[in-house]
């Protein structure tokens, strides 16, 4: 499902990589398999994919059917961090074109008043509902968003608004849990042993994917396959996620590359790059010892950052993502109807996708010639199944990479720092 290529890393000795890392990777493999990592109580994402999801699927299908009967056309999804980025990444893969979207999704994912006003204006004359995602119900951003949008929903629908709210939260306790129980809102679980950035294909992502009309169950099937593949062996030659983690560590510690730039040539996959940034940034950004993950969308960013990437200080490496079935070569250029005044007839019969592919190949050659190490990650399916596979693959790679650095992949003390200071100021 995933092909990892790294022949554009000059000076890499694969035998040395294997010799230096295999024993460490074997140890990490055992830690993950036997739940012996730091914060081992947060490893629920590993076994979650193999659990019986029948009850959750039924609840999701029932809610979709109910909202179909109510003719709900728009959904406000309220969440932040892992409760936003991953869900948006799913939607952009499974329902990117307007014709693929059964419902319009609006995200509340910050404390931007203008964003709140914009979305309130967008839904005020629509038939809409709310999905609110918060484990505790006390995180300020989603709490404030839910307060404002719940008031607007009740103002429009009165007591009928109760059927138009789904709370995804801790199934046993918390402010949002108590609100849902009190008002008899549909409630789906956030699992206490799965952190936000590792929760994309739990009910929060599954429900929203289902609401737009995607085959959301395939997200789990793809992740199941990834687990079977990645927990079979820790050998570098057999485990691409472990190889990727080792390459990142090698480039950072041995080749002194401090920045990783995740790159896509499809705007459709920008939020996948953001998800990559969150997974690695939040899991590894500790103790003043980590790669700095960022991303670019090409060819757009070639016209803003391309100069820096080509001729700037080489403190970075690139990880280029591609999806084999992302494009269907539907848009082909024809002979000009205006006497070739645009001078593009030499491109006749070529598709826009082919042009994008050539741009990708040319850029890789140019950057590699300038000494930029390049890792390539090719995913075979641009689908719910493919997303599920890639997401689980990234979760494994993130965990291994953080553990190689000696970090706890599953905590985020720096985030808690700002929260404490914010509440103190309020």
Swiss-Prot record:
Catalyzes the reversible isomerization of glucose-6-phosphate to fructose-6-phosphate. GO terms for biological process: gluconeogenesis; glucose 6-phosphate metabolic process; glycolytic process. SUPFAM superfamilies: SIS domain (SSF53697). PROSITE patterns: P_GLUCOSE_ISOMERASE_1, P_GLUCOSE_ISOMERASE_2, P_GLUCOSE_ISOMERASE_3. It comes from Mycoplasmoides gallisepticum (strain R(low / passage 15 / clone 2)) (Mycoplasma gallisepticum). Its main location: cytoplasm. It comes from the Bacteria. Belongs to the GPI family. NCBIfam families: PRK14097.1 (NF010697). GO terms for cellular component: cytosol. It catalyses: alpha-D-glucose 6-phosphate = beta-D-fructose 6-phosphate. The active site is at 282 (proton donor), 303, 419. The keyword Cell inner membrane does not apply. Keywords: Cytoplasm, Gluconeogenesis, Glycolysis, Isomerase. It is found in: Cytoplasm. This is Glucose-6-phosphate isomerase. Its EC number is 5.3.1.9. Pathway: Carbohydrate biosynthesis; gluconeogenesis; Carbohydrate degradation; glycolysis; D-glyceraldehyde 3-phosphate and glycerone phosphate from D-glucose: step 2/4. Pfam families: PGI (PF00342). GO terms for molecular function: carbohydrate derivative binding; glucose-6-phosphate isomerase activity; monosaccharide binding.
């Amino acid at each position: 499902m995933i092909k990892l290529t790294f022949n554009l890393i000059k000076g890499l000795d694969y035998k040395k990589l294997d010799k230096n890392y295999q024993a460490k990777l074997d140890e990490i493999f055992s830690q993950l398999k036997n739940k012996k990592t730091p914060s081992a109580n947060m490893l629920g994402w590993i076994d979650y994919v193999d659990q019986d999801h029948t009850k959750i699927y039924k609840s999701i299908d029932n809610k979709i059917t109910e909202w179909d009967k109510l003719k709900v056309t728009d959904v406000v999804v309220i969440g932040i961090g892992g409760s936003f980025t991953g869900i948006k990444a799913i939607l952009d893969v499974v329902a990117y074109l307007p014709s693929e979207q059964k419902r319009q999704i609006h995200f509340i994912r910050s404390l931007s008043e203008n964003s709140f006003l914009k979305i309130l204006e967008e839904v005020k004359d629509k038939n809409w509902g709310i999905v609110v995602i918060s484990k505790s119900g006390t995180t300020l951003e989603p709490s404030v968003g839910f307060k404002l949008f719940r008031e607007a929903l009740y103002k429009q629908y009165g007591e009928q608004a109760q059927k138009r709210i789904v709370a995804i939260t801790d199934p046993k306790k918390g402010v949002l849990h108590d609100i849902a129980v009190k008002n008899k809102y549909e409630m789906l679980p956030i699992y206490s042993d799965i952190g936000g950035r590792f929760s994309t294909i739990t009910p929060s992502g599954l429900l929203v994917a289902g609401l737009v009309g995607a085959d959301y169950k395939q997200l789990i099937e793809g992740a199941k396959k990834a687990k079977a593949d990645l927990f079979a062996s820790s050998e570098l030659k057999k485990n691409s996620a472990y190889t990727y983690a080792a390459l990142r560590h090698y480039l950072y510690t041995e080749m002194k590359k401090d920045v990783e730039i995740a790159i896509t040539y499809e705007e459709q996959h920008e939020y996948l790059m953001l998800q990559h940034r969150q997974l690695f940034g939040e899991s590894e950004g500790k103790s003043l010892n980590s790669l700095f993950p960022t991303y670019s969308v090409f060819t757009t960013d070639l016209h803003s950052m391309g100069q820096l990437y080509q001729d700037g200080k080489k403190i970075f490496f690139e990880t280029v993502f591609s999806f084999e079935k992302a494009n269907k070569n539907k848009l082909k250029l024809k002979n000009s109807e205006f006497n070739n005044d645009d001078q593009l007839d030499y491109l006749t019969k070529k598709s826009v996708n082919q042009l994008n592919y050539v741009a990708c190949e040319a850029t890789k050659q140019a950057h590699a010639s300038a000494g930029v190490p390049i890792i390539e990650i090719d995913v075979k399916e641009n689908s719910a199944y493919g997303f599920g596979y890639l997401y689980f693959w990234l979760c494994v790679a993130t965990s291994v990479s953080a553990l190689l650095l000696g970090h706890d992949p599953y905590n985020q003390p720096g985030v808690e720092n700002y929260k404490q200071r914010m509440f103190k100021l309020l």
